A protein has these predicted regions:
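Binuclear metal-dependent phosphoesterase catalytic core
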Residues: 3, 8-11, 116, 210, ...
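Glycine/small-residue-rich loop that forms an oxyanion/phosphate-binding "nest" at active or ligand-binding sites
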Residues: 77-111
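N-terminal active-site segment of His-dependent metallophosphoesterases
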Residues: 1-66, 73-83, 303, 311
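Active-site environment of divalent metal-dependent phosphoester hydrolases
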Residues: 22-28, 48-52, 72-79, 129-133, ...
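Binuclear metal-dependent hydrolase catalytic cores centered on His/Asp/Glu-rich metal-binding motifs
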Residues: 116-169, 194-200
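Active-site-proximal beta-strand elements of phosphoester/diester hydrolases
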Residues: 12-22, 119-133, 170-174, 248-255, ...
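Active-site neighborhood of phospho(di)ester-bond hydrolases with catalytic His/Asp-centered motifs
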Residues: 17-20, 40-46, 65-72, 108, ...
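Active-site-proximal segments of metal-dependent phosphoesterases and phosphodiesterases across multiple
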Residues: 7-11, 167-217
Length: 311
């Protein structure tokens, strides 16, 4: 007896990546995400200088999400000069811990979060990263996670990969991995004096490499920290998307400021991705207006020979 078989089309997943927030998060941002119809939201951190109230608003967002903390999220705790400027009594309060408590399992720094309905796991890189070849200002990682070296950090990130429920893994970092170029305009290129150099995180790169050797499906590595507007020139902006020979999409989502105002009102930036069958087929930077419709869209990547619906 012959059976008629029909190929099942993979589910299209829509993901929003929110770049460095820097205190620019309002209720309207959540409404905008609802309007965009996303299945998952990824936050690359830097909500503000230990901005507990901003993190509280993000934590209340009722859309599946994952978050990693940035260097600004431990601004008054990670460095000696930051501690000198701390606006609160650190013997009585800990705003870093308050943020982590608000986020709970949603914070994936040195951790992971499984999304059964999407059949994927989000694995976080090193939280509170300042970027660069060394673990700069990393005492906070030693205090909170017992991590003191790049090798230990890579191993801890990799442990989350090994604990992932799903073969499809999205990596979420505050700063991106090393290996994406050493020009100042590259995704993690150093754009301050002395100009040039790879400022990516080597521990993040090593963990991704280990996951690749284990044949994990890695459609996306996304991060922020290195703002798109360059310090040394205004003639160009930073390269935002890199596609590796293996087909991994590396996305720097750090559009700063992510909320701007014009005569028509506010525009809110999101990076939108469409993923199908474990592959990113489209990446766009969009600005959403006060009517919660897309006011402008810039396509940053589209899979060759793929017809993709507008975001």
């Amino acid at each position: 007896m012959a059976f008629c078989s029909e190929k099942i089309k993979p589910k299209m997943i829509k993901i929003a990546v929110v770049g460095d927030v820097h205190d620019q998060w309002e209720e309207e941002d959540g409404i905008a995400l609802k309007s965009l119809g996303v299945d998952l939201v990824l936050f690359v951190g830097d909500f503000g200088n230990e901005s507990v109230d901003v993190v509280r608003r993000v934590a209340s967002l009722d859309i599946p999400k994952a978050v990693i903390m940035g260097n600004h999220d431990a601004w008054y705790s990670a460095t000696e000069w930051g501690r000198k400027k701390c606006p609160y009594d650190r013997t009585k309060e800990d705003w870093v811990q308050e943020q982590l408590d608000l986020l709970g399992d949603v914070h994936v720094g040195y951790s992971k979060l499984d999304f059964p309905t999407l059949n994927l796991t989000v694995v976080g890189g090193r939280p509170f990263s300042w970027g660069g070849p060394d673990m700069k200002f990393a005492d906070i990682c030693k205090q909170r996670y017992g991590i003191g070296t790049v090798e230990e950090s890579a191993d801890l990130i990799h442990a989350s990969v090994k604990g992932a429920m799903y073969e499809t893994i999205i990596f979420l970092g505050h700063n991106g991995p090393s290996g994406l170029g050493d020009r100042p305009e590259d995704p993690c290129g150093k754009d301050w004096h002395p100009i040039g150099g790879d400022f990516g995180d080597p521990d993040f790169a090593e963990a991704i490499s280990l996951a690749m050797t284990e044949n994990k499906v890695i459609p996306l590595v996304t991060f922020g920290h290195m703002h798109h507007t360059l310090r040394h020139t205004k003639q160009i902006i930073r390269k935002r998307v890199f596609r590796s020979p293996e087909g991994i999409i590396y996305l720097n989502a750090a559009t700063v400021p992510r909320v701007v105002e014009n005569v028509r009102g506010k525009l809110r930036n999101f990076s939108l991705l469409q993923m199908e069958g474990g592959v990113v087929v489209k990446v766009a930077s969009v600005w959403v207006g006060d009517d919660f419709n897309i006011a402008s869209e810039e396509v940053l990547y589209q899979q060759p020979d793929k017809v993709v619906q507008p975001v």
